[in-house]
Amino acid sequence: MKEFITKHRDKFQKISAISGAGISAESGIPTFRGSEGLWKNFRAEDLATPQAFSKNPKLVWEWYLWRRNIIETKRPNPGHFALVELERIHPDFFLITQNVDGLHSQAGSKKLTEIHGNIFINRCISCGQESKETISENTTPLPPQCQNCNSFLRPGVVWFGESYDDFKLNFSIQRMKHTDLLLVLGTSGSVSMPVYLAQIAKDSGALLVEINPERSSFSSSVDLFLQGKTGEVLPELIREILDNPS
């Protein structure tokens, strides 16, 4: 790690990070994939789609409220706070997260885009109005309705088969094109978007550093692979970067 930083210290002008489910898992949040994602024998892929919502919006909302309840009991971990510290000290840093749990914001990240949305946002399917009003199965008929136009509300996340928000996507692409150092944190590459963004960064000349407990689809193309949990390895990496300013 030290040799890598010393050799490439002039590459630390513009630093970006992509975070995935691994950093949230360190806070105790299930990945909601595979066996962890099963709820009443439904898989995430069965419920997180426009078709599922159109067919049974009440069922989809019940699943998302179950997920919200789990996430609300969790707190940011050292990996989240290390990114906040990097943002505070480094003048040109930006974070792109796949995670919808809001823990990066809760930790204090400001230069952040939640490319898959935020599970605590409610968005109207007709007028697009968004809110963070608390929804409870005990007090709110499901699916909840928009106060502006009375259409159904849906969770403000990107579902399987949906397009990404144009502004968030275009901003992320431009950021990758002008990034010197990209940190890939806790994402396996099973979702195509982070792989796509990382490839843009690499093709544009960025150095790639991956932190993951196990090797992933990114590992063969990164410049440095650091095995371990983000919350354990990232603080050490950031200390090295900040101790060796460019």
From Swiss-Prot:
CDD domains: SIRT5_Af1_CobB (cd01412). Its cofactor is Zn(2+). SUPFAM superfamilies: DHS-like NAD/FAD-binding domain. Gene3D superfamilies: SIR2/SIRT2 'Small Domain, TPP-binding domain. Belongs to the sirtuin family. Class III subfamily. NAD(+) binds at residues 20-39, 98-101, 186-188, 212-214, 230. One of its GO terms (molecular function) is histone deacetylase activity, NAD-dependent. Transmembrane segments: none annotated. The active site is at residue 116. 2 residues (Tyr-64 and Arg-67) present in a large hydrophobic pocket are probably involved in substrate specificity. They are important for desuccinylation activity, but dispensable for deacetylation activity. It catalyses: N(6)-acetyl-L-lysyl-[protein] + NAD(+) + H2O = 2''-O-acetyl-ADP-D-ribose + nicotinamide + L-lysyl-[protein]; N(6)-succinyl-L-lysyl-[protein] + NAD(+) + H2O = 2''-O-succinyl-ADP-D-ribose + nicotinamide + L-lysyl-[protein]. Disulfide bonds: none annotated. It is found in: Cytoplasm. The keyword DNA damage does not apply. It comes from Leptospira interrogans serogroup Icterohaemorrhagiae serovar copenhageni (strain Fiocruz L1-130). NAD-dependent lysine deacetylase and desuccinylase that specifically removes acetyl and succinyl groups on target proteins. Modulates the activities of several proteins which are inactive in their acylated form. Zn(2+) binds at residues 124, 127, 146, 149. Substrate binds at residues 64, 67. This is NAD-dependent protein deacylase. Keywords: Cytoplasm, Metal-binding, NAD, Transferase, Zinc. The gene is cobB. Its EC number is 2.3.1.286. GO terms for cellular component: cytoplasm. Residues 1-245 form the Deacetylase sirtuin-type domain. Binds 1 zinc ion per subunit.
